[in-house]
Amino acid sequence: DKPTTKPICEQAFGNSGPCFAYIKLYSYNQKTKKCEEFIYGGCQGNDNRFITLAECEQKCIK
C-alpha cells in the first residue's frame, strides 16, 4: 500500500524548504481560505506552491 498524500490544497501553507533561493510563489492557506504569497527556498517543501495567484486560485478555491 502506498501512503496517501494529502491533496495539494490541504498540504501545509508556505513550506519554504531548507534551501536559500528567494522565489516568490503562492500557496493555499486553509486558515484564511485564500491563496497567499510566500518565499520558496528552491528545494523540497511540499506541493502546495504555485507560480501564479490565478493558478493557485483555480486549483484550490471552489
Swiss-Prot record:
Residues covered by the BPTI/Kunitz inhibitor domain: 9-60
UniProt entry tagged with the keyword Phosphoprotein: no
Residue(s) at site: Reactive bond: F20, A21
Disulfide bonds: C9-C60, C19-C43, C35-C56
This protein's UniProt keywords: Disulfide bond, Protease inhibitor, Serine protease inhibitor
GO function terms (MF aspect): serine-type endopeptidase inhibitor activity
Pfam families named among the record's database cross-references: Kunitz_BPTI
InterPro entries: Kunitz_BPTI, Kunitz_BPTI_sf, Prtase_inh_Kunz-CS, TFPI/VKTCI-like
Purpose of the protein: Inhibits chymotrypsin and thus avoids the accidental chymotrypsin-mediated activation of prophenoloxidase. This enzyme is required by the insect immune system to produce melanin which is used to engulf foreign objects.
Name listed for the protein in its UniProt record: Chymotrypsin inhibitor SCI-I
Organism per entry: Bombyx mori (Silk moth)
Lineage: Eukaryota, Metazoa, Ecdysozoa, Arthropoda, Hexapoda
